[in-house]
Amino acid sequence: MTAAAILAAAVCSCAPPHGAARAPAVASAAAGPAPEAGERHFARIRQLTFGGENAEAYFSRDGKRLIFQSTREGRRCDQQYVMNVDGSGVHRVSTGSGKTTCGYFFDGDRRIFFASTHAADTACPPKPDPSRGYVWGLDPYDIYVANPDGSGLRRLTNFGVYTAEGTLSPDGHTIVFTSLKDGDLDIYTMRIDGSNLKRLTFQPGYDGGPFFSPDGTKIVYRAWHPADTALTSYRELLRQRLVRPNRMEIWVMNTDGSDQHQITNLGGANFAPYFTPDGRKIIFSSNYKNPRSRDFELYLVNPDGSGLEQVTHHAEFDGFPMFSPDGTKLVWASGRSSREGELNLFLADWQP
């Protein structure tokens, strides 16, 4: 899900990709704010982006680059960009049309995939009617693959409904993602060529944001399974391509979809779970201490739900965490050191 929705709740190519343009020059990583009291896992923080909304930054397999989504170049909705881990070499890799989300490197960092709405409409999707309260729009994303400079764009899925939130298995062979293709928001896997499609979740409600464990045997995700009148309301909104995320908790399952079980019961919105590189803990974002606020913090928890520990201690949004492949760094999106309404990317040296 996009950064804007949550808040309301480098390859150097010799030419820009077709239909794309270089982003304006930006400063490379600057010394960021000092860690807040209690942020013992952060040895040093560096700021990577400066202005706008920037989120969902994911490392390349070699740990040298990041793909992320951003509103910049005067656009009203997110496009995909790649940069070096020091914040330099920023360039757009999506078409510049429609809205994009959830980019990821694959094929030995030789290709990327991301979700985009540009085939359905080149304009930004309309925002949900505010009279409906706090809802997310389920825009008609499909998943595309491209080269890391944005060239060679090819459509991987062709479902014509919300299909996004894709990430990659450790062996590089499987994409896990969320789709509305069968009428509900469920988690699926497929091979990187789009074959061998499998549905993993079947319980009514929103199952999404999946990531594989480092050993490839588990999938961690967020879920909300309403019941009774809440389920009726959920289905009515779904028909209108909307969802109201009243509550999301963290779940874990085997990669074949078996042994689905909830590991948090905190209340509020708990999302963006990601295993630590040793597989011993899960980091995620939550506003459970004040579910009506935008003050999301990062937390660690054991895979059995025990040992909850708060990681960030800043009165702004902190979310979308991802560890570098070697486990020495954490990248995440935060409102710290930013103007109101902005969200920037930060990189911290990680202390276990």
Regions found by a protein language model. Name each.
Residues 66-67, 112, 175, 219, ...:
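Hydrophobic beta-strand positions that form the internal "hydrophobic ladder"
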